Amino acid sequence: MALRLATRRFAPIAFRRGMATTIEHTKEPISATAEALSASRPPIKETKTSTVKEPQMDADAKTKTFHIYRWNPDQPTDKPRMQSYTLDLNKTGPMMLDALIRIKNEVDPTLTFRRSCREGICGSCAMNIDGVNTLACLCRIPTDTAKETRIYPLPHTYVVKDLVPDMTQFYKQYKSIKPYLQRDTAPPDGKENRQSVADRKKLDGLYECILCACCSTSCPSYWWNSEEYLGPAVLLQSYRWINDSRDEKTAQRKDALNNSMSLYRCHTILNCSRTCPKGLNPALAIAEIKKSMAFTG
């Protein structure tokens, strides 16, 4: 437990300003506990699986360079760095996730990132690629080999390791809105809560959110107030339940947002709507919540 707490506290924040700025390291020194933990660990011997080795290139190889953010919590005194990898695009799939998987499988097994469905459904592989928050499985590799690609973890998140962000605060906020159907009365037929076609249509553009956090971590207001401001993703989810005709706790849901921080830190910067890999519009959902609260309380 002590190791986990030390790692989370001193994991660097990937970005301080903007979505593609130079990394700044924290000014705060490493604690004595973290140093002791690091010193007490035996050194890891280099093996074939831990040695970075570029694959052999063919004569007609279409090479592209990827610069990837690296940070290892097992070496807390080492600063984050960018590590470069060169791949032959002729032997690599079309998506950024294909490149990352090939690097991990064939070049550097120590590279760490999240991934699961590879179809833009789970949201696991959210990261910042060439200055844009997106899903690696949906982001195509630019075919222009002269331009090098830079890959970072999601901006302004604590880093667990390499491209893995700490989503603890994000999911804590999601839990706070009670993202489930709340009713005091049972359905008339005792089977299910029915909904008209028109009411169901009101949920389009809301239920598709996969909680990848691309929008929230692109929002400057969320960067500055992430402890109190819920952020675009959670507010879109909140509107999804406020707008659900089957839910009977609409008033309570609005009351929970009726303070100066949870909702009203949105300043319509619209980064969230621009970056959403699913094409949703969190800014519109936030505006609709504000409008409904202004007219109905």
Curated annotation (Swiss-Prot):
[4Fe-4S] cluster binds at residues 209, 212, 215, 276. Residues 33-55 are annotated as: Disordered. One of its GO terms (cellular component) is mitochondrial inner membrane. A ubiquinone binds at residue 224. It comes from the Eukaryota. InterPro entries: 2Fe-2S_ferredoxin-like_sf (IPR036010), 2Fe-2S_ferredoxin-type (IPR001041), 2Fe2S_fd_BS (IPR006058), 4Fe4S_Fe-S-bd (IPR017896), 4Fe4S_Fe_S_CS (IPR017900), Beta-grasp_dom_sf (IPR012675), Helical_ferredxn (IPR009051), SDH/FRD_Iron-Sulfur (IPR050573). It catalyses: a quinone + succinate = fumarate + a quinol. Keywords: 2Fe-2S, 3Fe-4S, 4Fe-4S, Electron transport, Iron, Iron-sulfur, Membrane, Metal-binding, Mitochondrion, Mitochondrion inner membrane, Oxidoreductase, Transit peptide, Transport, Tricarboxylic acid cycle. Pathway: Carbohydrate metabolism; tricarboxylic acid cycle; fumarate from succinate (eukaryal route): step 1/1. [2Fe-2S] cluster binds at residues 117, 122, 125, 137. It is a peripheral membrane protein. Residues 199-229 form the 4Fe-4S ferredoxin-type domain. Gene3D superfamilies: 3.10.20.30, Alpha-helical ferredoxin (1.10.1060.10). Residues 78-157 form the 2Fe-2S ferredoxin-type domain. One of its GO terms (biological process) is respiratory electron transport chain. Signal peptide: none annotated. [3Fe-4S] cluster binds at residues 219, 266, 272. Iron-sulfur protein (IP) subunit of succinate dehydrogenase (SDH) that is involved in complex II of the mitochondrial electron transport chain and is responsible for transferring electrons from succinate to ubiquinone (coenzyme Q). Component of complex II composed of four subunits: a flavoprotein (FP), an iron-sulfur protein (IP), and a cytochrome b composed of a large and a small subunit. This is Succinate dehydrogenase [ubiquinone] iron-sulfur subunit, mitochondrial. It comes from Zymoseptoria tritici. The gene is SDH2.
